[in-house]
């Protein structure tokens, strides 16, 4: 992705590219086949300081923000979507810890020794992550947490979860907690075995009488919604769009390679010599670049404090998610029967792209939010 702006020190991109070449790319197909967690990639990113990409310099991090996090996720997604989603969730959760978490956790993340993730969606409220059913109540020894989380990326692999619950003191409000992943009473009912993103370990997690320290509170009791909207949402929306752009770009490039190299020997032509094939490929490129252009404008809007910044934040994931579905559909169509073979490579991107429209906030929810914003109706 052309970032639109160049960080003062972008040597981390060279480091990232080397990790992608040496560690992420060689493991991508195996992760998809077996559903293994990309532990080697996460360890390599941690050792290189990239898990601390958005951690403040004062705690040893790189001190970067939305733009660079989005770029990193996009680059990884073009090679391994599972690894990219793990990193996306880590950065979104890290943003909360940076804003409201303890220095010990911040420093561990900056050192590359701590992987974190979000734990918002629940069985009882599905993709309406702003309406947790799970509870928190003060007890002897701390706070008791009970909940049924429907999806947590890196479940059982992360070191901590940014965990949402109903507020203790105020009905209808949300509270966030820094939940140790090894807390007694946390249980993963079933392992993840999905259509796409097969190595991201997005499993349900149940909390039954989990006791955590009272100082695990992130922000104020009842202040979770504002943190979700003000801290998490911009990071998650932008990085999710970057994830989609990376996936689309990979699918488009692989499709172009396939049609260029594949011959119709009886006609002494390649598939690329067919106007219909070129037209479909052009649509793929245009859709990818349109999503990228909106993403870059969203980043600009946020950084410049424009009035339309929140509208753009809502738009980027909706647009990129729909585009990713369309572009990877076209990749399968253009590559024909060969697309169903693993060696062409586009079917993996086709499966991985399906997640973008259903991850909360889903595309349909975003369409509703955008429509409300345009009509001057409160979102909630």
Task: State the predicted function of each range.
Residues 148-187:
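A short core secondary-structure module
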Residues 335-380:
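Glycine-rich phosphate/cofactor-binding loops in nucleotide/flavin-utilizing enzymes
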Residues 150-155, 233-239, 356-359:
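Glycine-rich phosphate/pyrophosphate-binding beta-alpha loops
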Residues 36-47, 51-153:
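Glycine-rich flavin
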Residues 245-248, 252, 284-291, 317-327, ...:
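Alpha-helical transition-metal enzyme core signature, strongest for iron centers
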Residues 194-287:
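Glycine-rich beta->alpha junctions and the first turn(s) of the following alpha-helix
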Residues 233-237, 272-281, 309-319, 347, ...:
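Alpha-helical scaffold segments that form or flank carboxylate-/histidine-based iron centers
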Residues 25-33, 288-319, 332-340:
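C-terminal helix-coil-helix/basic helical segment that borders enzyme active sites and/or dimer interfaces
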């Amino acid at each position: 992705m052309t970032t639109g702006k160049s960080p003062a020190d972008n040597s981390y991109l060279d480091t990232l590219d080397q990790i992608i070449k040496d560690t992420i790319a060689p493991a991508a197909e195996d992760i998809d086949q077996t559903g293994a967690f990309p532990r080697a990639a996460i360890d390599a990113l941690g050792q290189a300081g990239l898990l601390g990409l958005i951690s403040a310099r004062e705690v040893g991090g790189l001190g970067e923000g939305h733009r660079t996090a989005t770029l990193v996720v996009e680059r990884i997604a073009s090679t391994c979507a599972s690894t990219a989603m793990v990193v996306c969730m880590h950065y979104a959760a890290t943003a909360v810890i940076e804003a409201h978490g303890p220095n010990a956790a911040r420093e561990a993340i900056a050192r590359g020794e701590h992987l974190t993730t979000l734990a918002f969606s629940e069985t009882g409220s599905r993709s309406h992550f702003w309406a947790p059913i799970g509870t928190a109540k003060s007890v002897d020894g701390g706070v008791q947490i009970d909940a049924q989380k429907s999806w947590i990326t890196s479940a059982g692999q992360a070191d901590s979860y940014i965990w949402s619950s109903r507020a203790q003191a105020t009905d209808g409000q949300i509270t966030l907690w820094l939940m140790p992943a090894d807390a007694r009473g946390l249980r993963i009912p079933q392992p993840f075995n999905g259509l796409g993103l097969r190595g991201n370990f997005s499993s349900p997690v149940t909390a039954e009488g989990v006791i955590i320290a009272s100082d695990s509170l992130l922000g104020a009791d009842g202040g979770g919604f504002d943190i979700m909207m003000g801290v998490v949402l911009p990071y998650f929306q932008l990085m999710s769009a970057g994830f989609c752009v990376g996936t689309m770009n990979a699918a488009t490039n692989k499709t172009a390679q396939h049609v260029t190299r594949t011959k119709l020997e009886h006609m002494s032509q390649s598939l690329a010599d067919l106007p219909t094939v070129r037209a479909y490929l052009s649509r793929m490129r245009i859709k990818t670049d349109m999503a990228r252009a909106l993403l870059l404008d969203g980043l600009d809007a946020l950084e410049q404090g424009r009035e339309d910044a929140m509208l753009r934040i809502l738009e980027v994931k909706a647009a990129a998610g729909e585009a990713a579905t369309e572009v990877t559909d076209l990749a399968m169509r253009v590559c024909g029967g060969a697309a169903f073979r693993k060696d062409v490579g586009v079917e993996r991107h086709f499966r991985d792209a399906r997640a973008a429209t259903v991850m909360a906030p889903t595309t349909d929810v975003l369409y509703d939010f955008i429509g409300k914003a345009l009509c001057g109706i409160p979102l909630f």
